[in-house]
Amino acid sequence: MKAVIRQWVRGAIVALASMAIYAVALGCYTALMGGDNLTVGTTSLTQAVVLLSEGSGFRTDSFTLTITPLLLTILLIWLINALIMRIKAYGPHAYVAGLIVWLGLNEAFRQSVHLGLVDDQWLVLLKAAIVFSIGFLCAAVPESAKMRAFRDWTRKQVPADIRHCLKIGVALAVAILSIYLAIGLITVIVWSVRNHAAVVSLFELSGMETGSRILTTVAMLIWLPNVMLWAVSWLFGGGFAIGDLASFTLWLGQSKELPAIPVFGILPEPVSSELWRTVALNAPLAIAALVGLLAVFLPQGFACRPLNVRNTSTRGPVLVSLIYSAGAFCLSAMLISLASTLLFALSNGSLGDHRLAHIGVDVMASTRVVGHSTALGLTAAWLLALIGIALVFPIVWLVERIKDSRTTATTPKTATVHQARFLASQPQESKEEQDDKHEPTDTSSTGLGLS
């Protein structure tokens, strides 16, 4: 009973501490941007930003904001995860207690905020529950007894090759998505460097001094993951839009009457070079193919050795490796498509109700350019591995045949040489010995004659 009560207390502490640290940090930064003291308006704005980071947007008289700052969401989930691991609130009782407290705090924020919320009460609380649950599960599931029992069961019931195939499939999906996001970050940096003059012009137009510019730039970073995802879609051919006012692709970059928001100053121009457009469009295919080939041939992957087809005993494992790699590639392509759909959907939002009602990417089009190219790249990697092995087999067979034919042709010649060497090694008889052999021999008669 004491253990259960302890878990309830720990769960409540996790929820209270997480919200306190998170809300106080946001409130201090908001006050730093708006004034020296925490005011009623700052507190309400902080509460609205907390709800916004959980996916619940708000509206004012001048604009509507529903673009979830994904960097804040990631930090909030990480904070919940870290406190759960620190306090060791892993049990289901801790989760229930923490979730109740967390929902209570979010409901208090929802009722106290002076800004109009876009979502209904049940949807606000549902999104808050999802955020807390993700943070809790990321910390508790790996440490739970049921997960350890499940891992033990899979080790006993599931063959090692299948488990390895599933692990490689998930690892490939994570690796390829990480590379795509890194490329998106690099693209955003390139945009910022190339278009910094436009950002400076927007700062000057808004009348911001150096301090305000720094604080505004830092505040804009909370949407960095969103812009990274837009950059991935733009680079791979999907593009993105700022409502009805602007559309950006590799071929098109037009805008009209965009709001004077500094972050809009970094948005890209169309790429004029046909070569660079081709490179960008084929980048996901090349990345997936390269990662797939590494997974097939590296020892940490499927360790496929084409030269093993020379021996009948080692030929079977090579074919088995190809079969399992095909399964892993299918799993990776499916996971990447699902993850891309979810991430692109989360990155979208709105800044208004009319011309700025939709800001972000076309989810289906962006998922198609990413998922389709990735699947083609993984398929190309598997086919290249198959073709390589198929080429090695006839080459090895031909080399062995040539060796056999050379050995067969060399055997009679070798026998003739050995015979000649044998005859040459015999001692030669002298002329006297030969004459003695040919002289008549005198033998004594028996004395018997014919009558």
Residue ranges and their predicted role:
Residues 87-127, 258-279, 295-351, 416, ...:
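Hydrophobic alpha-helical transmembrane segments of integral membrane proteins
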Residues 1-9, 78-92, 135-170, 193, ...:
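Cytoplasmic membrane-interface segments at the C-terminal ends of transmembrane helices
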Residues 21-29, 80-84, 105-112, 134-142, ...:
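Alpha-helical membrane-inserting segments
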Residues 449-451:
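Intrinsically disordered terminal tails
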Residues 13-17, 21, 72, 76, ...:
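Hydrophobic faces of alpha-helical transmembrane segments in multi-pass integral membrane proteins
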Residues 1-24, 83-95, 121-130, 163-181, ...:
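Alpha-helical transmembrane segments and their helix-start/interface "positive-inside/aromatic belt" motifs
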Residues 83-178, 185-214:
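Membrane-interface helix-loop-helix junctions at boundaries between adjacent transmembrane segments
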Residues 2-78, 111-114, 203-285, 345-427, ...:
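Long, glycine/tryptophan/cysteine-rich extracytoplasmic
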